[in-house]
Amino acid sequence: MLWVLYFLTSLFICSLIILWSKKSMLFVDNANKIQGFHHARTPRAGGLGIFLSFVLAYLLESFEAPFKGPFVFLGLSLVFLSGFLEDINLSLSPKIRLILQAVGVVCIISSTPLVVSDFSPLFSLPYFIAFLFAIFMLVGISNAINIIDGFNGLASGICAIALLVIHYIDPSSLSCLLAYMVLGFMVLNFPLGKIFLGDGGAYFLGLVCGISLLHLSLEQKISVFFGLNLMLYPVIEVLFSILRRKIKRQKATMPDNLHLHTLLFKFLQQRSLNYPNPLCTFILILCNLPFILISVLFRLNPYALIAISLVFIACYLIGYAYLNKQVCALEKRAF
């Protein structure tokens, strides 16, 4: 029944943040940002509730690999801090933020086995290259979750599903407790958006999911490609965003409002549908679920997982092209 404790702890801390923010305006978000799709000044420190619940679990539980040890806790804290500073309006440059995240990930990888070198049937890597690739993957998935954190419940919903799937595969993991911490936050976030996850929460959840999946891969409970498939939507979103900005000769770190979820939001909004923000989340998670469930069935079959990922990428590109065309056409008519 400890999951009840962590669920309520997360819910309680997030509730306190909402009340405190109304008085101090400390954690409130800027509704005028280019990637913003809300109007009210809303606290964006929901990740603090999840992280402090994790700290409580760290003190009360006997953590096993891959979350065992002070350096793992230090690394997770550094990655959370890299985003939380932004949440309290103490901005870091994208370069400094990435460096802080990389240092945190190195702390983790240096103290617990997370380096995957065998990517059969595609390739294998020497240990040093695999070590660097592990850093790239963990920093990458942390930022990927942050990129899709645009609407109520989207990033947290994807992570909650991932953590519950991980628990299904490995019931001995702590992923179930982490999932309930996320759900405690989601009570206040979805559908009405009383509080946002924030950069710190998004980075932390992305890293936790990445660590868990690499660990399961090394334990040979899943193919390494299953981890990719489980988080494929945020991964494709960040890679496609980088490619899109490179084509436009923009900085890869420059924010914009051309993500799949923002196009879907505009599409729903143009059709005057009620509650387009939570509806956008519901549609995207519903579209992801079939691919996740099929991947679970083939979690040890790399060939099937690669095929599933290619089908998902094709669906993503078709969906993106359709939404972009529809949104542009309707915007032209408006003028």
Region roles according to the model:
Residues M1-L239:
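"…together with the soluble PPM/PP2C metallo-phosphatase catalytic core" -> "…together
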Residues L56-E61, T281-L300:
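Alpha-helical transmembrane segments and their membrane-interface junctions
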Residues L78-L90, P94, L100, N301-F335:
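Alpha-helical transmembrane segments and their immediate juxtamembrane interface regions
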Residues S93-I96, P126, G198, Y275-I283, ...:
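Membrane-interface starts of transmembrane alpha-helices
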